Amino acid sequence: DIFLRWKLAGYKLIQSRDSLCFHFISRGHRSWAKNGVGKDDDMFKFYNNRASRNYLRKWHKWMSHDEYRMPITHPVYNIGFVITDVTSEDFLHFIETWATNIFIDNTICGDRYISKEQPTTKIDLSTRIHNHSYIEQINNDILLYFSQKDFMLNANENSAIITRLTDIIAEGVEDNAEMELGIFKMKTKIVKDISQTLIKV
């Protein structure tokens, strides 16, 4: 996160090939004797997963680097997922991190998910998960409509679309447009990159 924010802020990152530096111990302790050599400690996996999910909540796309390990910047969009036929907290666990907000038709399932997931993040999940009546009030720039039932019929392919959604939008989706891709229907008001607003913590 910090290196991506530096890059977006216009900082020049210089890599020295002839220097010594302290290495963060967060990765140094990832394997303990009790787990065996090369096996990640359970606590490391917990914190790594938690950090990864918070990163996705903010940036909506996993980090990528160039050949010199410099972060590659990408746009971030204010996007809401409008989902029907929601029955599974496990489904929400996957889908929630990839959007700014999600709107679901099963508030009981949503409340159970929030109760379980909230202890793992400082982000107030009640500001991210709403029922359908909040769609106009939240006013996302982009809305993506789909159902859990249709999604699960081809979960691998549909998951791949969700994880590539930022790139798909960046490749040429226009303002005030409607488009369909498989089970997904997208409506846009404005296709606006909000990444610059995420630099300051």
Predicted regions: what they are:
Residues 133-168:
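Short, well-ordered secondary-structure micro-motifs within conserved domains or adaptor modules
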Residues 24:
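Residues that scaffold the ATP/ADP-binding catalytic core of kinase and kinase-like folds
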Residues 1-20:
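A short, conserved alpha-helix in the catalytic core of glycosyltransferases
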